[in-house]
Amino acid sequence: MPKRRLDPLPSAAFQILLSLAGEDLHGYGIMRQVVEQTEGRMRLGPGTLYSSIRTLLEAKLIQEVDQLEDVKLGHERRRYYRLTSAGRKLACSEAERLADLLRPARTKKILRGRYV
């Protein structure tokens, strides 16, 4: 995979990694989690979601896992995704990079309230 696709990490890919930091999720679950964790500021459509998932899978930042509970409950097999250790490390690095970018805004008192 060409490095340029993940350097810097696109916002959609970062949000997908964050959504998988707590639990394994299927595509629709990732879409809902991204809306929740961004308080509605970001919504991933199916095209963006699945092209980002494909890129993250190819880079081994996430992996596909089976969820037998869905089958037991009579649901169609869904593709679930899990954050890999490399994905967690990249999410941490990206969060630190973003925090560093915001430091001047905090220092200059541009950010207020909950952002400080």
What role is predicted for each listed range?
Residues 77:
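Exposed loop/turn and edge beta-strand positions of beta-sandwich/beta-sheet ligand-binding modules
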Residues 49-56:
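Basic amphipathic alpha-helical segments that dock to polyanions
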Residues 57-74, 82:
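Beta-hairpin "wing" of winged helix-turn-helix
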Residues 1-9, 81:
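Basic, short loop/linker segments at the boundary and entry of helix-turn-helix/winged-helix-like folds
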Residues 1, 86-116:
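Amphipathic alpha-helical dimerization/coiled-coil segments
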Residues 6-48:
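N-terminal helix-turn-helix DNA-binding core of bacterial DNA-binding proteins
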